[in-house]
Amino acid sequence: MTVPTLYNFTEALQAPDLAFSTLRDCHPRRTATGGVALSRTSRFAEAEIEWQSRKYLLCFPLSTASIFAVEQTAARLRYLRTPLLTEYTILRDEMTYTDDTGTTRTCDVVLHRLPEGRPLSVCAAEFDAESLRSALDKLEAGLSELGFSHNNLKPGNLYVTSDGRLIPVRYHFARFGEGHDAEGFERLRQFVREQGGKGQMLCDAEPSRYTTLPEFPGHLFVGEMSDQLVRVEDETGYGFVDTENRPVIAPQFVWAADFREGRAEVQTAQGMGLID
């Protein structure tokens, strides 16, 4: 089977009126230099597009298994009406491309509507931490009632709406059935404890829970000591210092957890991972 390439996808986005069937009049988001803005997960490359006055993620399969892996989830979502999730549709034979032999072919893509709002990863500081925790509790209960497991929950995969609701996106690993999101929700709660409300001017006299300790000056945030390392946040992101406040891992991460047994979970612009 011939597999389309990322180059084919990029080429199609440059001329959607020629390459797409349903999405002929879509408009991809572009970079400052005029190129198409792309991101990728392990299964799909993604481009944010505007189509019929709404924003979507157009998801291009990176392997022949990618579409197969999401077919059951997409089929269930097609008939599910809930404010907790957004449209996630497989468009069959949507993209036309030319393979290396000069043969014209088509491939499937996934069209995923983005909620109105912004990712939690970039706007948590603008919302009260307690309100975000409450929204997480409601989302967890709601998804459990639906029998829906996202299986890749992280700040970049949750959108905050103008009324403070949380809506998950990117259902590439989602399943209906037994839940596996408990750990993901706990990590999100830790994230909002640390980031929620940091950008607000608080009017109450209660001191902030997170302060810079006297022995670790010069940081926006100082965490607990773990494995002889202290998690800190500076203007450039999260990093780690030793017990003498000397940099061990320079601040560079969007978010980071404390070290446990020699490893720590971190978030970069590309996603979540582990460092040691």
Where are each of the predicted segments found?
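Conserved protein kinase catalytic/activation segment
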Residues: 157-169
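Catalytic-loop of the protein kinase fold
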Residues: 144-156, 160
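Juxta-kinase regulatory segment immediately upstream of eukaryotic protein kinase catalytic domains
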Residues: 1-38, 69-72
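Conserved alphaE helix
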Residues: 131-139
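C-lobe/activation-segment region of protein kinase-like
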Residues: 167-199
